[in-house]
Amino acid sequence: LNNITLACIDSVQPDKAKKAMNRCKEHFDFGGEVFINDPQINSRQAYNKFILQELHKHIHTDFVLIVQWDGFIINPDAWNDQFLDYDYIGAVWHWHPMGRRVGNGGFSLRSKRLCELTASPEFVYTDHNEDDQICHLNRIYLENQGIRFAPEELARYFSFERELSNIKTFGFHGDFNFERLGLY
C-alpha cells in the first residue's frame, strides 16, 4: 500500500498504539508512517484539532489510514482496492440516517485532499468529534468540494464498530470488540 501513510496519534496509551501499528505493518508495506506521541494532545478536543487541522502536514502520500490502539487491521485479505475510490471510509454508524452512516474515524481511510480541506478556513470547526465534523457537520461543504464518501455497502467490508455482522472486515474500532475478536 505504497500510496497510503499509516498514522496513529496517541499520547494516552502510546504502547498499545504502537502495538496496533505493528499489527498493521505485519501485513502491508505502507508508503509512509506517522506516530505522534505529543503530551499536548491529551484530550478529545486536542486530538480532534490535530486530526482536522494538522494531520495533513504529516502526510506525503495520497491517502492516510488512521489507526488507534483499539482500532486496526484484523483481516488483511479483506483489503479491496475499491476503498481507494473514495476520500473517506470508516465503519457504519447504524444510529445515523440512511445515506449519512459512514462513519467512524477511529479506523478510517482518508484522502490527503480531504485532510487538507478539513484544515481550510471554510471548514467549520466545532467541539464535536472529528469524524462527526467530517461526516455530518461539514459533509455538504466537503461534497461540494468533490469529496466522495464511501457507500455504506462498501464500508461494511472496510470496518465495523458497533454493528455486529458476519462480514469479514478489513479492520475494526472499539475495545469493546476485543473479546469477540479474541484480542487481549
Q: For each predicted feature, which ranges?
A:
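Short, conserved loop/helix-junction motifs that constitute active-site signature segments
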Residues: F28, H58-I59, N80-L84, R110
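Short, solvent-exposed loop/turn segments at secondary-structure junctions
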Residues: S11-P14, P39-I41, D70-I73, H94-H96, ...
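Short glycine-/acidic-enriched loop or helix-start segments at secondary-structure transitions
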Residues: K18, I74-A78, A119
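Short beta-strand-to-loop acidic/aromatic patch adjacent to the donor-nucleotide binding site
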Residues: T61-I73
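Catalytic core and acceptor-binding pocket of nucleotide-sugar-dependent glycosyltransferases
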Residues: V102-Y184
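N-terminal anchoring/stem segment of glycosyltransferases
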Residues: L1-F63
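Conserved donor-nucleotide/metal-binding helix-loop-beta segment in metal-dependent transferases, i.e.
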Residues: G71-V102
